[in-house]
């Protein structure tokens, strides 16, 4: 929970509901983009007994948590519900919700649900093994994270739910439905189902028909920032918002995060550093990667798409390193009243660029068509404790995250022709001053860090404001509200050093993948169906 103003505010405010993978938040902003207060709660996704890889989304409990967060945010802000002019919701992508024909939610899964591995393989075999390419050419998605394998799994193993289903939405749309009673999806989030056309920004029912699935469960498509409905009396009683408050279409977390960062024009590039790292490039028109390495998603800006690559578990790897090896540093940081990562960065800053040649093996570059990673490890360690220690390994991890990001951006530039002239760096990773400088050095372009680094909720609030006429347009408002903390200029000497390190790392990583292929080591993660 956070609160930035201890007096009783007055005026107009916007609320963003942000449903992440591990937590949910209700965040209140004023019209200048200042965060006033937030209520937050963690939530868990439930494995189903005897269903490997399953992660169901608990509709009943999670709605209660959302209501708790809304009431908490209003309380912390010392605001009456009448001060909230509009509300919008954003969420993790790929997670889906099914409703019966009366509009009641009956089943949902989180984005991390991986139960449909067999169904992914089954669908790949369609059309002489060409179905996945057809899906990608239309939607920019492969089958690994799409909705179709999950729907096919339900048809196989839960035909009762499959037969009852009348409508499908994303998790952000479920929140909007719980508030307003209305059902619709937006292109930015629904695009990750693999069933939405990148050009028309509407459903492609023929993809479901080709897969032998029902095409009568597709809800209306409304653009982000358009009015969906109003808070019902029932929802108002449950969550504390005022009945009649406008509910506006939100969207996918990454795309709304880009809106909150002002990344709204073709050619702009962002690296979003969280548990996963996303490298996102706005493309001037819909285009796909002929090698199927990169996913293409609809932006929340109408008519625009984004090339998106993903580095796996980057933030999680740093947390693992901190918790597994840095107990002393955690205690010292606590005594000094600083963040442990800040202390580790201070230590790592004294290590020369290149980290004495240590090569972390964690996430690979993105290969969307055949998506798997090598076993986690460190390569090229030294027995010299002056050169190989916690500070060296921490710096090596930061350098490696930047190298993987640079590789992913290079892949995007290769097929799209869009090469980054600067990078916006946001998310938790952007709090690291050393990490920001390393990213600039590795990519060779200036890196801009915003004041508001967790921008998804701000982007969602902008959508709410546009939907009720408080803001003129999504793109103009995103540009106007973003404020910059610092710009990092690349060190050209380090750039050459990191280019050589990148070449070496790519060769070593290829060999490490071979060990996974031989069954000698265990992949960090592999997509369903591989």
From Swiss-Prot:
Report the top EC class in one word.
transferase
Supply the InterPro entries for this chain: AI-2_kinase, ATPase_NBD, Carb_kinase_FGGY, FGGY_C, FGGY_Carb_Kinase, FGGY_N
Supply one GO molecular-function term: autoinducer-2 kinase activity
Taxonomic superkingdom: Bacteria
What are the record keywords, sorted?
Answer: Cytoplasm, Kinase, Transferase
Q: Where is the protein situated, by its record's location annotation?
A: Cytoplasm
Per the UniProt record, which EC number(s) apply here?
2.7.1.189
GO CC: one term?
A: cytoplasm
The chain's coiled-coil residues are none
Q: Pfam families annotated for this entry?
A: FGGY_C, FGGY_N
Job of this protein? Catalyzes the phosphorylation of autoinducer-2 (AI-2) to phospho-AI-2, which subsequently inactivates the transcriptional regulator LsrR and leads to the transcription of the lsr operon. Phosphorylates the ring-open form of (S)-4,5-dihydroxypentane-2,3-dione (DPD), which is the precursor to all AI-2 signaling molecules, at the C5 position.
What family does the entry list?
Belongs to the FGGY kinase family.
Q: By what name is this protein known?
A: Autoinducer-2 kinase
What organism is recorded for this protein?
Yersinia pseudotuberculosis serotype O:3 (strain YPIII)
